UniProtKB/Swiss-Prot annotation:
Domain (EF-hand): residue spans on this chain: 144-179, 180-215, 216-251
Name assigned to this protein: Calcyphosin-2
This protein's UniProt keywords: Calcium, Metal-binding, Repeat
Molecular-function annotations in GO: calcium ion binding
CDD domains: EFh
Keyword Metal-binding among record annotations: yes
PROSITE patterns: EF_HAND_1, EF_HAND_2
């Protein structure tokens, strides 16, 4: 989980060993068109959560499921890319899992940390209550608000570490007319500021109060971006997007209400407004666009079709 597009699109595979509760993670690296090798990313060892309610507790089988976030101290892993080591924590999102293997390993004797499970459930309820309040405000304006919010946070982030304070977030919500009650905001802040240092990653803040698309949808966003990012730099020139975006099968083109060029120009204009650089789009900005679009589309397959059709994935 990173604002750096190259890091966000890294292809990783991990293994958890129940006999000693250790884990290891490898990265797929492609060299040329046909050669792929697997390199160590996180060395095999026993690790603990670095953030959240489970901070300090060792990873266990129950921590692994689609959508789970694994956290590691970047300083513990000397071989990590410099772009990742710039951040205190390395955060990895589980996007796929071998469910058959997982189910076969689960046993009725697995001890449950009931107090933490209850706390995490309550945390989710706090966020859901806020998300429900904001859902109506985001309806039909999701793309504009999410892309605008992402750009606004980048401008506030003078140090470039992704961390902002409480006043920054309150101001951002006010600017984009996403105000929530003081009680709800403080409840969310207590959960998000788990280190108690008065600063929170703005990506975590957005995911908490607005929510995020599921991993199935997100996998197609990554596929589209990776197809555009020919050189794997983490940013895509607007010229690449113009070249690859196909509006031929867009509903408004088929109905005759718009031309292909009008749809393409409208899409590019929306992206440009969201970008910090006028001639390229970062992965975070690309994801913000589709995060906003996702809010307005209920059915997963409808969303995937909207992605697959113009990008040919």
């Amino acid at each position: 989980m990173s604002r750096n597009g190259r890091d966000a699109c890294r292809e990783l595979i991990g293994f958890f060993f129940t006999h000693d509760q250790s884990l290891t993670i490898y990265e797929y690296r492609q060299f040329g068109k046909n050669r792929t090798i697997v390199l160590p990313f996180i060395q095999k060892s026993i690790y603990s959560h670095q953030c959240g309610r489970r901070k300090g507790k060792q990873y266990r089988l129950g921590d692994f499921y689609v959508g789970a976030t694994l956290t590691f101290l970047s300083s513990d892993h000397a071989s990590l890319p410099e772009s990742i080591k710039e951040n205190t924590f390395l955060k990895l999102r589980i996007t796929h899992i071998d469910q058959i293997a997982l189910d076969s390993l689960k046993t009725a004797s697995m001890d449950q940390e009931d107090d933490i499970v209850i706390q995490e459930t309550n945390d989710r309820l706090v966020f859901k209550a806020i998300q429900d309040v904001l859902k109506e405000k985001l309806h039909k304006r999701g793309v504009r608000i999410l892309t605008g919010l992402g750009k606004y946070f980048q401008q506030l982030d003078k140090e470039g570490n992704g961390l902002l304070d409480k006043a920054d977030f309150k101001q951002a919500l006010k600017v984009f007319h996403l105000e929530v009650s003081e009680k709800d905001f403080e409840s969310a802040w207590l959960i998000l500021d788990d280190n108690g240092n008065g600063k929170v990653d703005y990506g975590e803040f957005k995911r908490g109060i607005i929510g995020e698309m599921n991993e199935y949808r997100k996998s197609y966003v990554r596929k589209a971006f990776m197809k555009l990012d020919f050189n794997k730099t983490g940013s895509v020139p607007i010229t690449n997007i113009r070249k690859c975006y196909c509006a031929k099968k867009h509903s408004q083109v088929i109905s005759g209400h718009s031309t292909e060029e009008e749809i393409k120009s409208s899409f590019l204009e929306t992206l440009k407004v969201a970008c910090s650089k006028s001639d390229e789009v970062s992965y975070g900005e690309f994801e913000d666009y589709y995060e906003g679009l996702s809010i307005e589309i209920i059915d997963d397959e409808d969303f995937v079709t909207i992605l697959r059709t113009p990008w040919g994935i």
